[in-house]
Amino acid sequence: MLKILQARLQRYVNHEFPDVQAGFRKGRGTRVQIVNIHWIIKKAGEFQKNIYLCFMDYVKAFDYVDHNKLWGILQETGILDPLTCLLRNLYASQEATFRTGHGTIDWFQIRKGVHQGCILSPCLFNLYAEYIM
């Protein structure tokens, strides 16, 4: 089921990402990006131009995706309600607890984050990150 959702989601969001967005995208691996950066640095040197690079490391980025904002972004992107509804249902009523040395704490609702290891999460995160940039 997740593969079907992923294929449908990709159809909508691929045109939302700029060509320079490479993270979590098919055919845009790390090696290609390293070659691109190397070429840019080389050309800057040939033309004696300064070049500035900025690399971002999103620490625990998947953990901070706000669900309500994500649903709004999906709607603004024009993703059809049935697909958005399915995605919302995947995240509805999630709860967690922690086990400590003294037992477990009370259950609490999870309102942020995309699922770690889920094939939909990279696409959802990219859409969220592109929107907030």
Where are these regions (language model features)?
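Conserved pre-catalytic core of RNA-dependent polymerases
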Residues: M1-Y131
